[in-house]
Amino acid sequence: MADPIVHPGVHRPEFSAPLHARAEIIATLRAALGKPNTTLVGAAIGTGMAAQAASRGGADFILALNAGRLRSMGAPSIFSLLALRKSNDFVLDFAQSEILPFVKVPVFFGASAFDPRCSIEAELERIADAGFGAIVNFPTSIFLDGRFRADIEGAGLGFQRELEMLRAAQKRNMATLAYVRTVAEAQQAATAGVDIINLNLGWNVGGTVGSRTELSLRQAAEYAKIIFRQIRAISEDTLCVLEGGPIVSPDQMYEVSALSKADGYIGGSTIDRVPLEASMEQITSAFKSVGTLQKRIDELERQLEHVQREYSIVGRSPSIQQIKQRIEKLAASSLPVMITGQAGTGKKLLARGIHEAARRSGSKLISSEDASGESLFGFAPSEGGRKVLGLLQYHPKATLLIESVECLCVDAQERLIEVIETGAYRRLGDNERGRFEGRLILASTRPLPELGSSGQLIPALESRLAPGHVFLPPLCDRLEDLPLLAEHFLQALRKDRRSRKLSVDHSAYRVLMTYGWPENIRELRSVLETAAIRCEGDWIKSEHLPPLGDANADAPHPHPGEEREWILDALQRHRFRRGEAARYLGISRKTLYNKMRVYGLPLQPRERS
């Protein structure tokens, strides 16, 4: 066995099984699973470089497998079943020297039970003494079939021996993970009390040496849901994860996990071989065509600037795309626009975008928060007094933004209706009329229907504002826009302060993507500005971020019962077509999936009996 690699200047911690004892490992994984917008991710790899990269990328645990090592040598994963080397010696050689000293997440040792000459207890003692606190049955007999599988099982070297190994590992206080493929295997593993059960959907597709599969994503999800239901009926505490088959991208992983109610995903080829092949091809091609590539970069940067300028709203999520389409139509009309959304979602920026899109010559954007209406309409002087001009008279062609519209008194709301309907207004204190030829934009932090039902808006005004209503979703409902928003804010910061170009590191993104953002994009900008001051290099990392609280406790949420009915109504309206329902609700499809899981809503309409 090779001596552990020790890099100069890197401290190698002393690892032993008690440091990653069974209870500690499972508690760590459950804590990670409890964070918002989080799915457990395991990386099944075979080199120290891959393990460190996966750990930096946020992997919750590592599987050290002979298949991972073979992939790094250019062979497909299926070669792991061939008797090329003594598998446990092979894995121990690289995992102890390259992986254990340099990652802080739990490492599951891929242990083979095929060799009848090896005592299970002796192998486990050797693995535990090397510092491993967790074990997984790999290579495994579940990939065998037909007569060969029957012969292996008949010789007592198949899946039952693997379960015996996992049970023995638990007695040594080691965490256990079982590979399964069938309902029967899953039930046996659950009965054995295995901590994590990984449903393997077949060898991975994708890349140059990927396998083929006839299994669709939906079929994979439905099969996994059946398996996981069986597991949880036996052992509700068992963590259920999946791997392989048709899943080759994060989006596909999320779709299958959401539909099947999986706790997580294990990536093997999808984490090392497939992206490595693609990235090496791309970087080699980039070196060969650097001039052409730079032109493409310049073009993409121009496109990014265009996206950022478009109506002053940054993002490409479905809800934001829908808002942009709606704004394009509203900007070309004379309808009053009513913008609602939580504080900090960018209502004033959106108002400016609508104003600029309308291209009214000589027009300014003027804002008002006057509850009495005096600054809007002006008022006639009393005897000996002085006449006061209102904004409508002083800026007759401006775009007028009325913030916190619900604070307007009833008289001011009635006068506003007259402006909307006729373009005429009356000053307070007399009946003298003036003409307003500009644009009205109104804003509130409360939903429009709520403003009407609570009596804060008179019904006539609510009905006039409904056709031009635009709802800005909170940042927590469009987290897919966060990277683009971060780039936008850092680019603006660079221009304002003439500072260097900054980018957000993956470690910082992991923190940002799991935060609830109660103050929305306003808070994101503040966080990035603080991080930019703390950062001395070119990359903002997690340690540069200011402390972020638990937004999920503070952020306003609708009553669960009301929100459930609201979502169910949208699904029924659109015959459970989730993409259309999400667009109707103004949230992302991912957010809709999450909320459906939380409220136990069916993924398709129930058949009537």
Swiss-Prot record:
Keywords: ATP-binding, DNA-binding, Nucleotide-binding, Plasmid, Transcription, Transcription regulation, Two-component regulatory system. SMART domains: AAA (SM00382). InterPro entries: AAA+_ATPase (IPR003593), Aldolase_TIM (IPR013785), Homeodomain-like_sf (IPR009057), HTH_Fis (IPR002197), P-loop_NTPase (IPR027417), Pyrv/PenolPyrv_kinase-like_dom (IPR015813), Sigma_54_int (IPR002078), TIM-br_IGPS-like (IPR009215). Signal peptide: none annotated. Residues 578-597 bind DNA. It holds the Pfam family HTH_8. ATP binds at residues 395-404. GO terms for molecular function: ATP binding; ATP hydrolysis activity; sequence-specific DNA binding. Transmembrane segments: none annotated. One of its GO terms (biological process) is phosphorelay signal transduction system. It comes from the Bacteria. Residues 313-533 form the Sigma-54 factor interaction domain. Probable transcriptional regulator that acts in conjunction with sigma-54. This is Putative transcriptional regulatory protein y4pA. It comes from Sinorhizobium fredii (strain NBRC 101917 / NGR234).
